[in-house]
């Protein structure tokens, strides 16, 4: 798997590495120079921001499927749900906490849907974990 580093001499983990939930050792980059969402985080391309703090960015989807449609992302580059580690839990928890507050502020007062597409089968288009928040005044239809 790309990004995994081997054990150092004596079987210990190498300096500067992170052990994930499964005991794997990874070196995760803060941002990916080719990732469109990382470019939005860095301010290299515009995004219609909804919210921003040191860990999380929320911005409107450029192809909305409902009157309220925005995405929440961790600022740290994590390609997909498969790549999340325990170290990512605070940012992901913040994302889930913000989803309802921001949805309500943007007009989804009677409910909304959260969607996380993961991998090829899940039709993930951008390889940076993101949560879509979709809502509006009318029911969204069945899943």
Regions inferred by a protein language model and the residue ranges of each:
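HIT superfamily nucleotide-processing domains
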Residues: 4, 13-14, 18-143
């Amino acid at each position: 798997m790309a990004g995994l580093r081997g054990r150092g001499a004596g079987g210990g983990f190498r300096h500067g590495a992170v052990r994930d939930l499964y005991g794997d050792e990874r070196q995760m980059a803060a941002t990916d120079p080719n990732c469109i969402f990382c470019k939005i985080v860095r301010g290299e391309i515009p995004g219609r921001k909804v919210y921003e703090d040191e860990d999380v960015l929320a911005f409107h989807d450029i192809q909305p499927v409902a009157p309220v449609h925005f995405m929440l992302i961790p600022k740290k580059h994590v390609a997909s749900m498969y790549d999340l580690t325990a170290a990512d839990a605070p940012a992901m928890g913040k994302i889930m906490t913000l989803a309802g507050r921001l949805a309500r502020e943007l007009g989804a007062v009677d409910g909304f849907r959260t969607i996380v597409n993961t991998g090829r089968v899940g039709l993930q288009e951008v390889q940076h974990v993101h949560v879509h928040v979709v809502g509006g005044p009318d029911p969204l239809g069945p899943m």
